[in-house]
């Protein structure tokens, strides 16, 4: 897996990793940032990591295991972290958004360049996918999503275009 972590040095510098500290990576991804944190931790230090992408969890578990054993990965969204971590931490990091592997793997349904079934689920255990949102949500719901989450000023015209183009089955439609 070839993946270049964004702002890696700046993130590690900003965390000011203490060898015996406890850290959380809320968006593990392919463990670029977590790997660097784990390299700086001694036996007393610990890393908790969260990701909802099963493929990322599998890959990162193997990658981090080659660096150390003082970590725990949870296959869940970071919004659930308080259910799993009840200890003080010295630092926490998030790298929000899709990762390049998610965009590159056509069958994930995130691609801007390759045609694939419209999916866009980071967690394949979730029933709701992009196909259902695009094809079943009301005009009002689409406008709300585009405006509130995408900060899209043309939300109304885009939502109208989506409604008029239904059904939409693939990423390039």
Model-inferred region functions:
Residues 1-173:
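S-adenosyl-L-methionine-dependent methyltransferase catalytic core, i.e., the SAM/SAH-binding region
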């Amino acid at each position: 897996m070839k993946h270049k972590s964004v702002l890696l040095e700046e993130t590690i510098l900003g965390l000011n990793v203490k060898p015996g500290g406890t850290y959380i990576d809320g968006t593990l991804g392919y463990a670029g940032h977590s790997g660097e944190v784990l390299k700086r931790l001694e036996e007393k230090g610990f890393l908790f990591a969260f990701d909802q992408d099963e493929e990322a969890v599998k890959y990162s578990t193997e990658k981090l295991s080659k660096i150390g054993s003082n970590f725990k990965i949870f296959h869940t969204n970071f919004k659930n972290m308080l259910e799993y971590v009840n200890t003080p931490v010295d630092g926490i990091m998030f790298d929000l958004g899709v990762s390049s592997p998610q965009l590159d793997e056509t069958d994930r349904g995130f691609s801007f360049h390759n045609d694939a079934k419209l999916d866009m689920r980071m967690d394949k255990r979730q029933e709701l996918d992009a196909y259902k949102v695009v094809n079943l949500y009301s005009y009002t719901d689409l406008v709300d999503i585009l405006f509130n989450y995408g900060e899209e000023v043309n939300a109304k015209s885009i939502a109208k275009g989506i409604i008029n183009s239904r059904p939409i089955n693939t990423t390039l439609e």
